[in-house]
Structure formats: C-alpha cells, structure tokens
Amino acid sequence: MRPTAGQVFGSRYELVSRIAIGGMGEVWKANDGVIGRTVAIKILKDEYMGDPGFRERFRAEARHAALVNHEGIANVFDYGEEDGSAYLVMELVPGEALSSVLEREKILPATKVLKYVAQTAAALHAAHQAGLVHRDIKPGNLLITPDGTVKITDFGIARLADQVPLTATGQVMGTVQYLAPEQAGGKPASPLTDVYSLGIVAYEALAGKRPFRGESQVAIAMAQIKEAPPALPSSIPEEVRKL
C-alpha cells in the first residue's frame, strides 16, 4: 500500500507531504508527535519488503549513518518495521539536491564548486575515519541547503572497510557515471573510491557535462577504466583545472 498523508509510523511519525520518490522508496516530510519536531521519513517500497537483501540494505543505511557524527552528513534518528513496511527517520534538510541545481543551472562558478567539494570532502573524511566508504557519491546524494551547506545522504550501499559486503563478490555497486575504476572492475571500494566520485561530480559542475559517456552502462564503465577524462574548458581558472 502506498503511503498517504496522515498515516502514522511507529505510533509517533505522522506523514505530512511527499518530498521525493526514489528507486527503493519514498521520502516524506513528517511530524514527530513525541518530541514535536519535523523530520524526513524514508519508506521502503512494498515490493522490496519480501527481498531480504533490500531490507538488510535499508537497515544498513540506518546503522552506517549513525556511525558518523558530522555536520555534513544528514542525521538518522530512528528505524522501524511494522505492518509490512520499513522506515528510516532522518533529519529534514531544507534545500535541494545538487542534481536539481545542475539540471537548472547547468554550470556552476568555480568558487562555488570548490566550496561544495571542500565541504563534501570534510564529511567524507569523517566517514572514512569511522571506517565507512559511501560508494555512491553523486549529485543526487548531496543536498544543498539555502545557506550553501552540503549534506551527504543515502548510505544505503555504504560499506565498512572490514565488513563482509552485502553483495556478491565482483558485483558492481554505485551509479555508473560516477564509478571509480576499481568499482567498474568489480574490485573492493576504498576511501579513494569516494574521492574519485567526488572528482567526477566536480567535473560535471564545472564543465556542464560528465567526463565519460557511452551508449550503455557497460560502455561508460569501461571508459572509466580505460580512458582519461577530457580536459576541462580553458575558461576555468588554471589552478582549478590542475586540482
């Protein structure tokens, strides 16, 4: 059954309005009736509740995000399962995803890109210090608040460095346009994987396009492994292009 406004989860979280619909579920604005704050609640789609792998990945998102306390990572407050549904309660971050910003503005000023990259890198460093690799850094997982603060979201496929993966050996996890070469080759991810993906995000924001293209996901993945990215436009400051 699809979530509806007024529905209550965990006897305390009342759904107010839908924020977004993603591949695994829906995100709603909700009121916490116990302590009186407004939160975001992600609800796993019904069709995935019968799949142990999806349910475990959903639980893992709660566990992983809770490992890191950093201003650049959206807080997770609660997790629950009831009546055939699973839900994740998170900090409600005002603003929009970087993907929406890029769709609207196409290219961002170098100063703004550097600011976003620095904030994201600091948050990733905190995650890496906790032994956590995000594995899916992309514009859609970077929320930009009205004051220009970056918040990383969606630790659903993140992995602890010393943890047995949730997926089969050699299975590729992540979004192909932002995959690091080792991910594209089915090898284990590391903190450098996130750094590479952040570099792809920066390239896209500066150039208005992604560095690697192809007619299929496989072709794009192979380009990540075998090709060097095209040079950034000469209109971008030299020190930024070198970085």
Feature map (PLM): residue ranges:
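Activation-segment/catalytic-loop signature of the eukaryotic protein kinase fold
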Residues: 79
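Protein kinase glycine-rich loop
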Residues: 15-22, 27
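Protein kinase catalytic-loop region centered on the HRD/HxD motif
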Residues: 120-132
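Structural helix C-cap motif within protein kinase domains
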Residues: 207-211
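AlphaC helix of the eukaryotic protein kinase fold
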Residues: 43-67
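Activation segment signature within eukaryotic-like protein kinase domains
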Residues: 116-117
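Conserved short submotifs of the Hanks-type protein kinase catalytic core
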Residues: 83-97, 101, 105
